[in-house]
A protein has these predicted regions:
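Soluble "head" domains of membrane/secretory-pathway proteins
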Residues: 3-4, 11, 18-19, 23, ...
């Protein structure tokens, strides 16, 4: 009985950590250079899972996505119902130029029809791009992303320490 009482705090702490990691926040490591210059290979991020769903997914959020057997980190560019295109390194949403207020690499021209053979992004789907556009494996190659495959939003960078803090979109 004394052993059970002595070990109970450890069991409760371990259970709490498992619950938090499973349902609230999860650490994720940036793999590759597709999000440069904003995120770098080896950066350690915290992904918020709880409360992140279709009602609060916003353009330019940095999200963790299940893509096959791996998790990838990309930026939300297109939302359901929108027509997206890039011309001369400018983002067009429903034929209007939209400023991207973050650092990204040159984007080759493309339009939504090349990605999904559709005029607008279907309900429950999102267009994502990496910030390092010339090398990123994103919606231009893998197609639109299902809402169910968006695991969470990257909210904090915890490594390297010199860049510790919120991830602003």
């Amino acid at each position: 009985m004394k052993n059970i009482i002595r070990e109970l705090p450890y069991v409760l702490i371990l259970g709490g950590v498992i619950l938090i990691r499973t349902f609230i926040v999860t650490p994720v490591i940036v793999s590759g250079d597709s999000m440069k210059p904003n995120l770098h290979n080896g950066d350690l991020l915290l992904e918020r899972k709880i409360g992140y769903n279709s009602t609060n997914i916003k353009r330019f959020d940095i999200v963790v996505i299940k893509e096959g057997k791996e998790e990838i980190i990309k930026r939300i560019i297109g939302l359901p119902g929108e027509h997206i295109s890039y011309k001369n390194n400018k983002l067009y949403v429903n034929d209007k130029v939209l400023e991207e207020n973050f650092d990204f690499r040159k984007t080759n021209d493309f339009n939504l029809e090349e990605i999904c053979s559709c005029n607008s992004i279907p309900e429950g789907k999102y267009l994502v791009l990496g910030d390092n556009r010339p090398i990123s494996k994103d919606s231009r190659m893998i197609g639109l992303i299902d809402e169910k495959d968006i695991l969470g939003k990257a909210v904090y960078r915890i490594w390297p320490i010199s860049k510790f803090g919120n991830i602003y979109n």
